[in-house]
Amino acid sequence: ELVVEGRAINRTGGDTPEVGLVVTLHQESVSGHVDAEAVADIDGIFRFEGVESIEGASYGVSAIYQGIMYGVDIDPLQAEPPVELFVFEAVDDDSAFSIEAASLLIVQADEPRTLWALEIITVANRSDTTYVPGTDPMKLLRFALPAGARDLSVETALPGEAIQVDLGFALTSEIQPGEYEVMFSYMLPYE
């Protein structure tokens, strides 16, 4: 049996313990999925004892803080405790993130005068907060598409979903600190 110990840390404004945070240990293996819960103490410490060691299993810890899921994959067989689970304060100020790079590739132009375009956008949150768009549609992470674009396909590591908005699409996801790629492709008629 294994012991998993870690610390819940709020990174907004410094590294402070997140007292009382409910932390979930996840174990995924061929025999199924098992969850266990622990509460972070006054020092942000959480501990799971009696964790079954299963060869080939995947492990992780997660917590929901201010409505946002934070998590980290772990390897309890490695001798590098404690696990650090970082959380951040939620804000709806879109200055928390920026577009750091954008590329447009015309991948193919075919006979019926149709282009296949691929756009790759790098979104970065360099702040110590998590951007949460709230209910205002104008606060969503929005992307414009050219007139006549069709067959949109969106791929990103950001959570949430892509929804259609006027003149393009938007992502409903929060943006935690870090860097994320948003890739989308579409077909476009040309003359």
Descriptions of predicted regions:
Residues 1-191:
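Lumenal/extracellular ectodomains and adaptor appendage modules
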